[in-house]
Amino acid sequence: MKMNLHCFANLISIMILELFSNSGLINATEVGKRTDALEASAWNESKWISAVDAPVVKGHNNGRAADGASWFVSTVKNEQKIVSAKWMTAGLGVYELYVNGKPVGGEFLKPGFTHYAKTKRSFTYDITDIIRTKPNAENMLSVQVTPGWWGDKIITPGGYDGMIGKKCAFRGVLELTFSDGNKKRYGTDLKNWKAGIAGPVKHAGIFDGEEYDAREPMGYECVDKLSTPEENTEFSGDILPSDGAEVYLRTDLALAPVKAYVWKNVEGAKENEFGKVIIARE
């Protein structure tokens, strides 16, 4: 029996590369609190948007997803004092949220696995405690999206036709409640958002892990490189609130090894890819 550690090694590399950036543990200081989704009709006030310059897979390419990470950025100016702020979000691809440069939510590999053409899970956060609430103050919303769950080989086992031509996309609705009780919603659109390929993530896939260049600034730090997005019409399925099967970093479950064993007379026992770069092209 030959021991195949490829999948486990890849999973470990994903977790490590998701955790670290040039500023340290980026997901260990997440802000925002999960809350109930807005009513489903709120999605009508938004569009799926993609970066015009986002690369796409044009052929099978050995199952490799398109390079680069799509970034989406918008700045919202308060018309009045804010007393409540909720952000309902969904992504075509694995996505990470930021408000004024701070990561929102502690989930990993959001939105998780669903049938890529039928259903996408949404995540809604109460971000009242982290936004600037004074009148005329500005808040920057930003999102990174990579191909996982949407445009990489995990969605099409046995064939890669499903990943051809797909662009990462983001959709969201910000609901602000003002001090006078009135509410206003800001959905993703082509006028108030910017998009482009940027940031330190140069390639990402569920099975393949990430290529990460920590010398590069985050997408919200180089907005001048972004431009007007385009509407994405590739997904026509349902957007449903997450059902509670998310992945979190559980430091409370960390265990320290007491003993270690080396198995002898087992074929492939010492064959593994720990510590090696396994995603890079040869």
Predicted stretch roles:
Residues 10-22:
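Bacterial N-terminal signal peptides
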Residues 26-28:
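Boundary at the C-terminal end of the N-terminal hydrophobic targeting segment
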Residues 32-80, 90, 241-282:
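Solvent-exposed, flexible loop/coil segments flanking beta-strands in beta-rich domains
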